[in-house]
Amino acid sequence: MRSRYGKAKATSKPRARSKSTSAAASPALRRPFRGSYFKTPKCILLGGLILRPPNASERVVKTTKKKMRRPSAKSSPTPRKRKKRNAHMLGVPAVTIAVAAASLALPTTMFIAMPQTITVGSFFTGMAGCHFSCQDIPGRDFATAFWVEKESVARKFLNANLNVQGFHDVCDPSFLADAPHTDFVIGGFPCQTFSQNGRKAGIDDPRGVLVVFLLIYVRRSLPRMVLLENVKNLMMAHMETLIDILTILKGIKDPETLQPAYFVSFRVLNSMTHGGIPHHRERVYIVAIRKLRRAIRFVWPGPIPCCSPASLLDRDRVKLSSYDVLLNNMPKGKTAQNNVRRAIEQVRSVAQSEGKHEMHYLPIVDLHSSALNMSLEYLPCLTEARGRARAFWSLAHGGPLSTRELLRFQAFPTDLAINVSAQQIGGMLGNAFTCSVVRRIVEQMVRAAEGRT
């Protein structure tokens, strides 16, 4: 064939149109993606592509030689029946549709029972709050397979109360080599470096990165459930560290499907509202549950009624007849004495305004606080420093809370083998879980792991 300028014009056979050409010609993908497409409920996110089904007024033209255009306004007003559109008409490759259909065909709820005896790996064990939290969960037995603890005082306590394998250092390579596989991993990683009362060094403190070794174990062992705990300030002042932990957990892949292995969620819970204990203790809880080719429906435990402080105090304690008795027998230390005086003044003011006797209340006051830290209805947050110093006093009884009372305010059993001093057990309780909160979370985790809602 010759062109108008006399030169031969090369001719070629028209290429066969492939599926990808048809997909590229679809109006669903040719139109630019504007913000309105993301707001419509008909927008579909699939395989990383944002797809918008074609409008009823759009007409898909299969030929590539003609331009796609909207029908003019002069077209017949009679509404046409909308034709059923196949997958290729939405601009999605057939392979993508097949993979998506296979994933959507998986059951959203599938019962995969946990073993009757759930083995537990305890990190940063301390007082073994994880062990005592799971003892009363109905329908399941929890057996601690190992614990990891570096503090010598805590190790002494653990050896007297848990007859299981113990490891000294989570950073020791022999730990990762020798630690057995478990169904459930739990750990309250060191909080001093993230606490509002500490130096707030975060991951710049060597203790701030110890959680990484727990995550390495999770990556290698792939337990069915993981529960982490730390102070609320982790979410407030160290949010980047919290995000890193969540990202690492979400990035762990299932070796069979190469998809994310865990459902991950976190929430701040208060022991007073979610543990039924009059103890104002807010903590961040991070939950991870193995998906095992199904969707996880985990529901955080809701608020429950709180018991009264009087129910947790020793019954043999005798209340003072008047605060004048306490004013004549003040504790040692200028700060402690000032806090007692201010607390008594506040209690008397409240009693006068409510028309009650001043000894009607059971106030608990922190003697070592620079500002008055007292409550008539609950225990202020127990920390390691306050627990070690036995700083919390029952004002109505004129003395510090006993070890048994502190155990009850953390929902621990009181029949433990206590082979350390009262100051040491108080400091350990300041670092411990509130057992009733952890128990309720674990119950929900087991239900979600088995596909029960």
Regions inferred by a protein language model and the residue ranges of each:
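Class I S-adenosyl-L-methionine
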Residues: 173-182, 192-381
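Arg/Lys-rich, intrinsically disordered low-complexity tails that mediate electrostatic binding
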Residues: 1-47, 51-86
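Short, solvent-exposed loop/turn segments at secondary-structure junctions
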Residues: 127-128, 190-194, 232-233, 274, ...
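Core alpha/beta nucleotide-donor-binding catalytic domains of modification enzymes
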Residues: 111-225, 232-240
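Conserved alpha-helix/loop element of class I SAM-dependent methyltransferases that forms part
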Residues: 106-107
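C-terminal target-recognition/interaction regions appended to catalytic cores
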Residues: 338-453
